[in-house]
Amino acid sequence: MFSPRGTPGSGRRQAPRTGGRRSVSAVQPGLLFSPRRSAVTARSTPTRVQSHAVVESYNFDVQTFGSSLPVKVMEALTMADVDDQISVKVEASGWAWMVCGERLIVWKVSQTSVAKLSVCKDLQLPSSEFAYSADLVSISSSGPLDLAPIQSISVLAVSPDGLVRFWPSLAHEGSYTEISLDLSGHLSNYVAAVKGGSFIVSSYRGHLLRLSADSSGKLHHRPVQQGQGMLSGIGRRVSSLFGIRGQPADLSVFSVLWVKASSCLYSLSSCGLSKWEVDENSETQVLSWSTNQIITDSITDAIWDSESNYSEIKKGVNVLYLDMQPSNAGLVVLAAAWYPGDTPCVAYFCLVTLAESIVPSPDLLTVEVTKYNPPFQSEEELLKTRLVLPDPSSPAAYLYNEELVFACSTGAGRGGLAEEKILFSSPGDRVRGGGVCADLPVFFSQNSGLVAVLARETASLLPETMEDSLCTSVAGPGPEGTPLETPPKIDMVAQEDKTKLLKQAFLQFCRHDLVGAQSMVDELFPSDGEGSADLDTVVTQIDLDLVDDYPACDPRWAESVPDEGAGFTLTSLILLHQLEDKMKAHRCLMDFLLQTGLLDRLTSTKVRSCPMATRLLLCEHAEKLSAAIVLKNHHAKHPELVNTAIQTALKKNSTDTPTNLTPADVFFREVSQISSIFECLLDEEEKALKEHPDAARWGEVVLSVNDIIKDMLQAAAQYRETKASLYRAPENCSPEPEYIPWTASGGVGGVRSVISRQHELILRAAYPHADAELRSVLCEQLVALLDSLLSGYVAQLTSLRRGGQQERYDTLENEYTQKRSELLKPLLELGQHQWVAALAEKYCDFDILVQLCERTDNQSRLQQYMVKFADQNFADFLFRWYMEKGKRGKLLSQPMATHQQLASFLQAHDHLSWLHDIHVQDYQRAHRTLYNQANMETRYFSKKKTLLALSKLTALASDMPEPVHRRQLNDIVEQERFLLHQETLPKQLLEEKQLNPDSMPLLSPQNLISLYICDENRGANEYDFKKALDLLEYFEEENGIDVDALKREIFSKALKKDWKESWSSSDDNDDPLEAARDSTFVKILQKLIQERVSLQTYLPDIKDLLQEDELESLKSKPYFEFLLRANYEHYLKVQI
């Protein structure tokens, strides 16, 4: 199926059929498609088809239809002169008629095998100097023709020069009416019975007349109404937009068709396609569509687009329309095309399907180039070929002429027929006409009468030439180098060659011998696993042979096929057909593997130095076929670019092109290497960017390269996706190797590398120099390429997830994340927000999405992403992103709808969650968070102090129960009291110790004591020593610290300071109490008394105190001990 070109142009107008009596000349057999003869048992047939085989055919049974012919028919055939033109028409109603010279014989076909008394009338046609044909006769009835009695059936016949004879009732062959039509000197070519018992008569030059008879049997005629539909009268310029056109003077009509089901009349002419809706008394033209140039362009593309001189060929191609039939997909037009410059000049028969539409479009047209390609002789010979479509819902089609019937398909639906030419070549035999009867294709053989062609159940699933090639590869060339006509016996093939043996089993399967195929498979690869080690290699090789097959039956390849003949040969002259046949063969192979149980037994094969599941490698082959078909279609649109790239690819691979082949022939043969074109296309693009500074010149190359690579990769991905079930892994299979699709291959020439290179080329060399319109297209194309690259990573990661390879998965995921960011960030920087968003959303690049929303200040889009990607924790990612970027204000100012999500996130981030709690006025929760954080803070003094203060404030603002409230506040106050000891450290001391009040660490009670009583605290007074003593209460018994020793150390430090500063200067005769009155020690005692501390229990024993190291030097001074004991005793008595 081919998409048509949309570019209009001037078409070559075809000459009409000439009307003189013509002798029938034999059509030479086609070059390539001789039918194979094989004695294959035919299936059972309905009673209307006799079991007698008329001609031999490989895929079809050709058998007599119905009972024997009426005597008058056989008599007319026997008595016919050599110059008499004989033609037959068969209608679905069961009626048939034969024109033999100037005799018209009408009969009802009996569909039973037993001859019964049937209706048969012999009518005399008006004399004419021109030869009659069955197309100039039609029958009508007021009721259904298949049930109508003979009395109600009327017959109308028109001579080529316009003399009309009308029989009102077939029961009275001698009663008729005649009139003469004025056709302006032109010959008539078709008669069609339409509604209301009337008839349409057409001429080669476009005269359309409607004839009807009154009650007396008198004929009346008038021209068919032209352009009288609802769009008529609106002006020629406007009406052309809707497909309504005027009729030119030199119109040539090729076919006229009446479709009873829709009551529509169609005319195919040199002006295009016209359509009328017909009722009992009038007709309305509803369509006149210029199809000729579109059809010609589409056919030309389909056949010659790979030729290097395509533009020259296109100007000289001739297309001739031959016939037209209805189908559910639209009107099917039979056309023949030839190029006089070809050697040899071949006529290509094509089936063009025109889907109907109110406003027709070229997109509704498809072309199927059949494999019936005889040598071109003359237009007159081509016009002898007609078309039969037995079932409107099926693509099955039959072409026929006097020599043969060719089975094929319209290409407009699934299924179809095996293409085969069925020759009626016995002496004196000719095919005189045909039609459809009882839903079967029925043809009139001069020797055998009516025959039906039925597809055999044993017909091979493979394309015909692929079937022959398979036989050749199994058994080697036959005596004359031709393929074997039947599969060889197993003992004819070397037993050790499992590839050949499995090919033979495949061949048997394709010929519907499933039992024989299964038996051979079981013998080659028993289910117990013996011999299965080679299974993956053998299957892979067979499929590779299919996709890389040499078209050995193409005459141009005759001298270029390897001698061993181990491949599958193809015969099509058209590259696209070769690729399509390879795809059909691949699908047959997959069906064979599935039904014989081999598919589930496949394991893995080494590809590109890595193991891959064999079933996925088979899928890869089909993907490359899909990509090759796309590339072939692009070859027609960009011949110069693709041809140059192909030549470069062949040169890189050191592949020679034989003189009788084009580089395209050689390149498209080896489908498995189709991806080698990508690098070569980029080379051409880079060359264009360097050589042509003008964007108008290099822009076309860049866009074309993007389109080609994009469409090829998308075709491969689409096949992989739509056919995934065919290549699925069996249930409970062991873990498979990592899957690296060919569309994600790295390294030199790998698709991933190619796309990365193209990304860099476009953004560096093309985008900066392009205008706005070109930039938009470039970005759209680039995004499609990046989509392919990223989807390859996803496929890889998915395979690793299934295989349980966590370490490799993590490594690849990091690579994927980094690559994704590298590819998308430049587009984001260029402001291509729409395309960036599309990719980032598809591949969940949350970082890019957040950056995009931040750049555009689009908070609503962020909220949408939170909903869209809720199951992937987008909200957590966003909140974390805000934290990492220091955007805590934005984090804490989220809309109310996200408060719950934010609260959940902040549970793991207590340092921020309390702010959110305050924002939502949950003060109790905020207090709890701050209180816990304060208790856990052991590093920074100022932080702990701040947390305690905030915790106190939130506690005061909260509505917690009173007992809890009081307990929490008391604890906070107590902690603040302890912190006050550190906060009131002397400034001079802090500077001495190089401690910054804002960043100093949180000090322990022991550290604080040491600081207060250290020598560096030169200005220490009773308050400092009293704070040190107060800090002793923060030591718990379980800490293992000797509090009494610390107390002695504090007092000893105070005493040593006193001795140094004042006591040492006192006289022994001084009053000890007066001498110590201003000392630090005494002031400490006074403060303890003020605080009602029991000195008796609190003060350390004097003996223990004097043993302190700090007082070691004072032990030898009696006055010191005297002063100490005197003050001890005095203050103990004072407290009593």
From Swiss-Prot:
Q: Which UniProt keywords apply?
A: Centromere, Chromosome, Kinetochore, mRNA transport, Nuclear pore complex, Nucleus, Protein transport, Translocation, Transport
Region feature (Disordered): 1-26
Gene3D superfamilies tied to this protein: 1.20.58.1380, 1.25.40.700, YVTN repeat-like/Quinoprotein amine dehydrogenase (2.130.10.10)
* Entry-linked Pfam families: Nucleoporin_C, Nucleoporin_N
Keyword Transport, does the record have it? yes
GO-annotated biological processes: poly(A)+ mRNA export from nucleus; protein import into nucleus; transcription-dependent tethering of RNA polymerase II gene DNA at nuclear periphery
Q: Which InterPro entries match?
A: Nucleoporin_Nup133/Nup155_C, Nucleoporin_Nup133/Nup155_N, Nup133-like, WD40/YVTN_repeat-like_dom_sf
User: What does the tissue specificity note say?
Assistant: Widely expressed in the embryo and in adult tissues. Higher expression is observed in the brain, testes, ovary, skin, and kidney.
Localization (cell): Nucleus, Nuclear pore complex; Chromosome, Centromere, Kinetochore
Gene Ontology cellular-component terms for this entry are:
kinetochore; nuclear pore outer ring
The answer to keyword Methyltransferase applying to this record is no
> Function of this protein?
Involved in poly(A)+ RNA transport. Involved in nephrogenesis.
Q: What's the protein called, per UniProt?
A: Nuclear pore complex protein Nup133
* Organism field: Danio rerio (Zebrafish)
**Gene name, Swiss-Prot/TrEMBL:** nup133
